[in-house]
């Protein structure tokens, strides 16, 4: 009996393999975006420059401290940990669904004790009977002739694969978030150093002006103007101290652990990226490699597979229940010859009247597929805009940096000239103060543009799908 049951299981599995499926043929929707990215460099050579998703984050970021901070975040960040656990959960759910493809075989041992009163026995006396049985069998195994179970299995598989892409997408976002937080801290630290230096310079200028005022060489207006600039620099220094502290708190949160002081930057690095320039590539190819786009496509494939299950529900479902074993009135008799028992119960269920439930279920599945198509297309459009915005910013950053550096040089020269003219008695103190303000503002603006340039490299790397390796 046991060998027959095993043979039956093999036959059923083979029958399942040859069963049909009603999942619609999947066709990837066309990307609703232009054929090329605007502002992409025309000299880019795909053969010479690898795509962003092929560049590991360790190879992309130039600063060793930043690489170490990112490595810490990948180990300790809770959001990434949740994404990894979601993969384990989806994998387990897929295994549960996949198990329905095969018969579930179980063993049962039972004892039945029954007492009958004398009125119901031939002897006229009360009798107690016992029955022992031991069986192995399967219960309600569905023969998947129309692919309902396999469609649900395909849906579960796509959902599981989608969580894999979600984890990759979460890692890309984490790498970019850590890099931007680290760079922001570096910029604010540099701004703080500039504010402190400016405060010290203005403090010296204020002290000199006070002495000149006491000697009657300058007016009270000059003294108050010097005091105004001094307090402005003091306020800026306090504000940037607060920004630096907040930056460190944000960095500790995203990393998931306190950071050693030696990993925190005091100024923006000259080059945040070790890669000179990322190629934009062809939108339809580049965007299709982004994990968030792949996740959206997995959701679309899952919805498409669910249509197959909804279609199969219109057709008969056949299930089998079978068991084989032994039975005896005594425990020792279970192993005697002639005690074998077996049962075989096929069951077919044919939907006749469901009050529109099956049609409605199919409509829901098809509408959900259409929703996922729209979400997939929206994800591509959003990704295209991210890349296009980053490229548009990159196209002007070099010019902005050159202009800001030239402005700092010009204002510094103007300040030195104003200082010399003031000391020579040619210009008023007001002209010197204006030159100080202009130079300070130009230096702050240059730090901001340098931060934008570094952050643009991070944004473009993320937008092009880099950072998950």
Q: Which functions belong to the PLM regions below?
A:
Residues 213-217, 422-426, 463-467:
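A short glycine-centered flexible hinge/capping loop motif at secondary-structure junctions
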Residues 92, 99, 165, 172, ...:
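Regular, well-ordered alpha-helical segments
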Residues 25, 29, 55-56, 64-72, ...:
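Small/polar-residue-enriched beta-strand and adjacent coil segments characteristic
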Residues 219-221, 428-448:
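Short terminal targeting/anchoring segments
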Residues 216-219, 383, 390, 425-428:
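Alpha-helical heptad-repeat coiled-coil segments that mediate oligomerization/polymerization in large
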